[in-house]
Each structure stands twice: as structure tokens, then as C-alpha cells.
């Protein structure tokens, strides 16, 4: 009989908040915002759901998803070398990789399929026709499923019993969504920000996480379950700082003043 493991919900929620915030900040601040400044433009406004640059173009648009791709791949490598016994740290990097790579690949599929969002300008700029669009959609879908399998592999030692992994993922997914919505609620056009940006980029792009526990449990041998995630002051304080800063700064957005 499996020994029941009690993971601390507050610490898990903190890991989820920080992991999701890494994707949001990478996309909007480092990606779009960084490219805007690097190309000599100025940021007119920047929030958790939109960046308005004085310059426009495919480079700035693609910088957001490409920043997610870069951070996601880096996190994947870190998670791969993290000690299996370092449960919170390894779980954090697995989640960072999952949120960033699911954002990149999920948005790629949606943007190319609908001709909107970050990939739209690039498709127009480079005259990408139907065959190219179908190819990009296939690449995005493949990347999403590879990310799903990676996340499941990273959760194997947390998946016995399956209810343990299910609880962890549900807390993480809900925390990400609530954080995104709480931040967007302070936007000057809150309803639009919530319905068209915050909810899709948090709940929908990462919805594949909800199937991770079943996949992880199917691969679990129950030979070396990870230690329980205990209450961690440093993770909780870190999440509190990032969460409050995100809501109060990126929520209403930063607007340039002349």
C-alpha cells in the first residue's frame, strides 16, 4: 500500500504563480518590450496582456513567443539536471518549462490558424501561404505534445498515488489562472483584457497540464516517490513579491509620460 504524502498547498501554489509569471514576464516584458527597446523604439504602454511600442513589425511581434521558447528550453535543461530529491526546485523548473513552451506552441497554433495575434504580421510579411501555415500549425501541435510528455516525465515521481499529481497540477493551473485574472482585472479595459487575453493565455494555453497526472501515473513504477513538498518560506515570500508586483504594476500597466 502506498504511503500517503501530504504536499503543502501554499508552497505548490507559490511554485505555480512563479512559473506562470515567468512565462508572462518573458513574453511581454523581455520579449515584446525588450525587442522594442533593442530596435530603438520606446514603450508607449506595457501590461500583463499587451505591449504598445512606438515601432511595429514582425520582429517585435515574434520576440514575445520566441522569449517563451528560449526560457522554456533553458528551464527544460535545468530541470533535467536538477537533483530528483530537490522536489520543490525540480518541480518549479518543470512548471517553468511547461508554461513557457505551452504558451509558445499553443499561441503558434492559434495565431497561424486564425491569422491573428503575434504570428500574423510575420505571415503577411513573408507571404506565407496555406502549405506554410499548415506546416507551422503542425510544428506548434507537435511542440505542445512534446511539452506535455516532458511535463509528465517530470511528474512521474510525484504521481503515486495519481491523486497526488492531480492535486499538484490542479493547484498550479488554478493559481496561474487566478493570478492572470487578478492582474488583468486592473487593466483600463478589464473585461476585454480578461476575456481576450488573461483567460486564454493562462487557463487555455496551459490546459494540457490537466492531462499530465494520468500520463505521469501510467509511467510511475512507485520505486522512488519524491519527498513531500513542505511549507517553504522562501518560495512563499518570492511568490508574494512577484504576485503583488505583477498585479499592482503590470495590472494597470506602465504608461510612458512625456
Please place each PLM-identified region on the residue numbering.
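Short, Lys/Arg-rich, polar N-terminal cytosolic tail immediately upstream
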Residues: 1-9
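Small-residue-rich helix-interface/hinge motifs
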Residues: 9, 15-68, 72
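Metalloprotease/metallohydrolase-associated module, dominated by Zn2+-dependent proteases
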Residues: 45-46, 52-154, 169-180, 184-188, ...
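Membrane-interface helix-boundary motifs at transmembrane edges
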Residues: 80-90, 156-165, 222-229
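Short, aromatic-rich membrane-interface segments at the entry and exit
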Residues: 88-90, 191-198
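Alpha-helical membrane-embedded segments
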Residues: 201-211, 238-244
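Interfacial loop-to-transmembrane junctions
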Residues: 217-242
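Juxtamembrane boundary at the C-terminal end of a transmembrane helix
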Residues: 246-258
